[in-house]
Amino acid sequence: TRRSSDLYQKRNETNELFIPPGARLGDKVLEVSNLRKSYGDRVLIDDLSFSVPKGAIVGIIGPNGAGKSTLFRMMSGQEQPDSGTITLGETVKLASVDQFRDAMDNSKTVWEEVSGGLDIMKIGNTEMPSRAYVGRFNFKGVDQGKRVGELSGGERGRLHLAKLLQVGGNVLLLDEPTNDLDIETLRALENALLEFPGCAMVISHDRWFLD
């Protein structure tokens, strides 16, 4: 029937998400040694050590306030640990996606918000037409002309990913990337991560997604 055909086409259209590949990773990716971080008397992270091998997808779970986002901020250099070390490999380029989606201009169109008005965008180390890049996040045709303020939660989530992934990192730090995403976009993100040639660290309360 026409309805089932339309639904099938819509499902196919939303079953795509593009994570731009970064430069090839070397053998050393990330090593954390004896990390400690506290705020006043409250210790968030105490003597944490781990390493991330090439090609790994690492899930980070824990209750709210446990220091998961703080760990990401230390890894990206936004905060400093009280003690311990975080060592990134020489080939590592981080791409961070935080959980805060308010820093977008509601008066701009989807295309303007991602492209800055440029017809050609630098995506990692390559260039591509901006409308093609935005389209890889399931904003097709007229959807690219939607105002940011009119978007649903799931659409804002896709827009957020499109903005922050364009740096073309080879190690992704994804903080609650599944918030507000619909089931088809969740599956598309899962597939994109599995196909991503670099590493990813994912903070999520969504155990189904992490599994």
Describe each region flagged by the PLM.
Residues 22-211:
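ABC ATP-binding cassette signature C-motif
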Residues 1-4:
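Short, small-residue-biased leader/transition segments that mark boundaries at the very start
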Residues 6-7, 121:
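Short secondary-structure junctions and interdomain/linker hinges
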Residues 7-31:
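ABC-family P-loop ATPase nucleotide-binding domain
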